[in-house]
Amino acid sequence: MPERLYQEEKQKAVNVLNDLKIKLYNKGFFPATSGNLSYKLHDDPLIFAVTTSGKDKGTVTHEDVIFVDKDGKPVEKTKMKPSAETMVHSYIYQKTDAGCVIHVHTPANNFISYVYFEDGKVKIKDLEMIKALDIWKENAEIEVPIVDNFFDLKKLAEEAGKAINPDVPAVLIKTHGIYCWGRDEFEAKRHVEAFEFMFELMKNLIIFKGSKDIW
């Protein structure tokens, strides 16, 4: 690819991630520098932009984004470090048609992942918001996989990668957060907003009924 076009793609990726992180930060999805985002530039070889580690998502600087390969290694010389969970993003890109990945930590997704962890998944059914996932079926039902929050991030990435279901654009990590993806930034944002809406509703139903058996 000509250098000029490559630089244009890189700048687009930076712009997309900066815009997206501010929008989601303003929704309260990135407390205490948590979470990360990425945007794919190329499939073969896999190259994607990912937010750098430990940065406040509510601000924009020239050190917020780094470009990495499928092994999570920087493709250019840099002093910046990619997010510690970059390999989860890589597995998602390798196993799905994702063009953008979003990872957020919220009270609702932590609650749901804790309550349903022993089941290995959380069932969601009969909610209108499922349509936001491009699932248009009567009595629609989906299952979001839940994996343990391994301290070893390599192990975490491997287990999350194994759990990925290309038909359901999300994986939950127990008392940690959710990874959502879409074919582009618009779809990924829509998906994460839909899941967070459904998890908040489910949390309230569990509390109201006094049971996790809400369906």
Swiss-Prot record:
UniProt enzyme class: lyase
GO molecular function: methylthioribulose 1-phosphate dehydratase activity; zinc ion binding
Matching InterPro entries: Aldolase_II/adducin_N, Aldolase_II/adducin_N_sf, MethylthioRu-1-P_deHdtase_MtnB
Record EC number: 4.2.1.109
Domain of life: Bacteria
Gene Ontology biological-process entries: L-methionine salvage from methylthioadenosine
Manner of cofactor binding, per the entry note: Binds 1 zinc ion per subunit.
Annotated positions binding Zn(2+): 103, 105
Keywords annotated in UniProt: Amino-acid biosynthesis, Lyase, Metal-binding, Methionine biosynthesis, Zinc
Pathway given in the UniProt record: Amino-acid biosynthesis; L-methionine biosynthesis via salvage pathway; L-methionine from S-methyl-5-thio-alpha-D-ribose 1-phosphate: step 2/6
Reaction(s) the record says it catalyses: 5-(methylsulfanyl)-D-ribulose 1-phosphate = 5-methylsulfanyl-2,3-dioxopentyl phosphate + H2O
UniProt cofactor(s): Zn(2+)
Tagged with keyword Endoplasmic reticulum: no
GO cellular component, as recorded: cytoplasm
HAMAP family assigned: Salvage_MtnB (MF_01677)
Function recorded in the entry: Catalyzes the dehydration of methylthioribulose-1-phosphate (MTRu-1-P) into 2,3-diketo-5-methylthiopentyl-1-phosphate (DK-MTP-1-P).
Family: Belongs to the aldolase class II family. MtnB subfamily.
Protein name: Methylthioribulose-1-phosphate dehydratase
Gene: mtnB
